[in-house]
Amino acid sequence: MLATRNRLRTSADFSTTVRSGVRNGRRNVVLYTAAIAAGEPSRIGFIVSKSVGNAVVRNLVKRRLREAGAASLREHGTGLAIVVRALPASASASWDQLREDYDAALESTLNRLAGRPQRAAAKGSAGTTQKGTPRA
């Protein structure tokens, strides 16, 4: 089980990560990864919908993905928010396939995240219009 400090728990946390993060999909999973404050512990959340299968299958997939996530948290302990969405194909995937897809998607999102320019802090754009011209 993941520690509370390493779990995404609120809808707002999930939404922020999915909207502002980078996405990478594989056959069995889609990963969304976003940078958070460097000193904060990395957090991970899982989305396993009913399209994956019945409750037994969903929980099996969730347990496997949680273990893969725990291993990645040992490597990347701070500064990341990760949302893992299981696709219907994950129901029939083996542990090795799930782990391989998870690791490949995480590596890809981390590479894309590293190449992405850091967003500047809000500078208070109240003085300009959308086109950048000064307001009257």
From Swiss-Prot:
GO terms for cellular component: ribonuclease P complex. It catalyses: Endonucleolytic cleavage of RNA, removing 5'-extranucleotides from tRNA precursor. Residues 116-136 are annotated as: Disordered. Keywords: Endonuclease, Hydrolase, Nuclease, RNA-binding, tRNA processing. It comes from the Bacteria. PROSITE patterns: RIBONUCLEASE_P. InterPro entries: Ribosomal_Su5_D2-typ_SF (IPR020568), Ribsml_uS5_D2-typ_fold_subgr (IPR014721), RNase_P (IPR000100), RNase_P_CS (IPR020539). Residues 126-136 have a biased composition (Polar residues). GO terms for biological process: tRNA 5'-leader removal. NCBIfam families: rnpA (TIGR00188). GO terms for molecular function: 3'-tRNA processing endoribonuclease activity; ribonuclease P activity; tRNA binding. It is an enzyme of class 3 (hydrolase). Belongs to the RnpA family. Its EC number is 3.1.26.5. This is Ribonuclease P protein component. HAMAP family: RNase_P. RNaseP catalyzes the removal of the 5'-leader sequence from pre-tRNA to produce the mature 5'-terminus. It can also cleave other RNA substrates such as 4.5S RNA. The protein component plays an auxiliary but essential role in vivo by binding to the 5'-leader sequence and broadening the substrate specificity of the ribozyme.
